[in-house]
C-alpha cells in the first residue's frame, strides 16, 4: 500500500515547501449544514465558535450546562481541536422553554446563535465546509500560483486524508493486525476507525494507480459514473463513451473509484479489472472488509474545490479560501500545492 505522502499527484509533485497551520488561526473551518433551524421542535441547534477544544469535549460541556445526558448532544462531524472552527451542536431539550445559552461558558468557545429544530442532527448530516487556510514560508510562489490555477480548472485527487489513518498510521496498522487475527474487536470506536481506515486506504490506492496514467480522466468501458453532487451512479457502456466523456469534461459527471467491501463494486469490464489489479497486493484488508460485512461503495475520483480564491500577503505567505463537500479533505488540496513537514494525521477531518 502506498503511504499518503507518496500517493500520485494530479499536477505532479510540488516543487516548493511550506508550512501548514503554524498556529490555530491559520486553519479556519466553517461548517455548512445546508439548511436553517426550523424554529420549533424538541431539539436546539447551537452554533459554536471554538479554538483549542475538540468537538466531543464541547458537546459534553454543553450537556452538563443543560443538565442532560451526554448522548442527548449530537453533531454532524468532528472539527479540529487546534484550529478556529464554527460548527453546530444539537441538544435534545423537550418543552417550550428556551434555555439561555448565552450563559454557556467554556474557555476557547463562544455561542454564536441557537434555535429550536425538529430533528436530531446526525453524523454526516452536513453539506460541506468552508475553509480559510494560511500557508507560510512558501519557497516557490510561482509554482504554487500555477498549481492554484490548475486546481481551479482540473481539481485534485479526492483522497481520504492522513487523518483517516491515525497518528503514524495507527488505525491502518490496527486494521492489518485485526485482519491477521480471528479475535473479535469489542471496542466499537476501534472497529469503526480500523474498518474506515482499511476501506479508505484501498480507495486511495485505486485512485493513485489510475492517476499514474496520462489519460486517467478518460472514461473506459465499465466505469461507474456519478452525477456531480449526487450519490447515484451508472455504468458506462461502449456505445455511450463519447457522450459521457463530454459530460465528464464539463464536470456534470464524475468518474468514481471503489471503496471496496462486500457485494459488487459497481464497475465492470476494463474498469473493474483495473481496480482489482490496483489493490491485488492487499488481500488481507479486502478480506477483513468482507468478513465484517462492510458494504462496497463508490466515491468520486476527483475533487473540485468550489469558490476557490487566494491572496498573497507577501512572497512567502498565501491565504486560501475554498469550499468542499462533506467527506472531503482540505489536506488533499494542500498536498497538491506544497510539500509540508509534520503529520497531517493530527488535523481532524
From Swiss-Prot:
The keyword tRNA processing applies. It catalyses: uridine(13) in tRNA = pseudouridine(13) in tRNA. Residues 155-303 form the TRUD domain. GO terms for cellular component: cytosol. It comes from the Bacteria. Pfam families: TruD (PF01142). It is an enzyme of class 5 (isomerase). The active site is at 80 (nucleophile). Belongs to the pseudouridine synthase TruD family. Responsible for synthesis of pseudouridine from uracil-13 in transfer RNAs. This is tRNA pseudouridine synthase D. It comes from Enterobacter sp. (strain 638).
Amino acid at each position: 500500500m502506498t503511504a499518503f505522502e507518496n500517493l500520485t499527484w494530479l499536477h505532479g509533485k510540488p516543487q516548493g515547501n511550506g508550512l501548514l497551520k503554524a498556529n490555530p488561526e491559520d486553519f479556519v473551518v466553517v461548517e455548512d449544514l445546508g439548511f436553517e433551524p426550523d424554529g420549533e421542535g424538541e431539539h436546539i441547534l447551537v452554533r459554536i465558535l471554538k479554538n483549542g477544544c475538540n468537538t466531543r469535549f464541547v458537546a459534553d460541556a454543553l450537556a452538563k450546562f443543560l443538565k442532560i445526558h451526554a448522548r442527548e448532544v449530537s453533531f454532524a462531524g468532528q472539527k479540529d481541536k487546534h484550529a478556529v472552527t464554527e460548527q453546530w451542536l444539537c441538544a435534545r431539550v423537550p418543552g417550550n422553554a428556551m434555555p439561555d445559552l448565552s450563559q454557556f461558558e467554556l474557555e476557547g468557545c463562544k455561542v454564536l446563535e441557537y434555535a429550536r429544530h425538529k430533528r436530531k442532527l446526525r453524523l454526516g448530516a452536513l453539506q460541506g465546509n468552508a475553509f480559510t487556510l494560511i500557508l507560510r514560508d512558501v519557497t516557490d510562489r510561482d509554482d504554487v500560483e500555477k498549481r492554484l490555477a490548475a486546481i481551479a480548472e482540473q481539481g485534485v485527487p479526492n483522497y481520504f486524508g492522513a487523518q483517516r489513518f491515525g497518528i503514524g498510521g495507527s488505525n491502518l496498522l490496527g486494521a492489518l493486525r485485526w485482519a491477521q487475527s480471528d479475535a473479535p474487536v469489542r471496542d466499537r470506536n476501534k472497529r469503526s476507525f480500523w474498518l474506515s481506515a482499511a476501506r479508505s486506504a484501498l480507495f486511495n490506492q485505486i485512485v493513485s494507480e489510475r492517476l499514474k496514467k496520462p489519460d486517467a480522466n478518460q472514461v473506459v468501458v465499465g466505469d461507474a459514473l456519478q452525477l456531480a453532487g449526487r450519490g447515484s451512479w451508472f455504468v458506462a457502456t461502449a456505445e455511450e463513451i463519447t457522450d459521457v466523456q463530454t459530460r465528464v469534461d464539463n464536470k456534470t459527471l464524475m468518474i468514481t473509484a471503489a471503496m471496496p467491501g462486500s457485494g459488487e463494486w459497481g464497475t465492470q469490464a476494463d474498469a473493474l479489472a483495473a481496480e482489482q489489479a490496483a489493490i491485488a497486493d492487499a488481500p488481507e484488508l479486502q478480506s477483513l472488509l468482507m468478513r465484517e460485512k462492510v458494504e462496497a461503495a463508490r466515491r468520486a475520483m476527483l475533487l473540485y474545490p468550489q469558490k476557490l480564491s487566494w491572496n498573497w500577503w507577501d512572497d512567502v505567505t498565501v491565504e486560501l479560501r475554498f469550499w468542499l463537500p462533506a467527506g472531503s479533505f482540505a489536506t488533499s488540496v494542500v498536498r497538491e500545492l506544497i510539500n509540508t513537514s509534520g503529520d497531517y494525521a493530527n488535523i481532524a477531518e
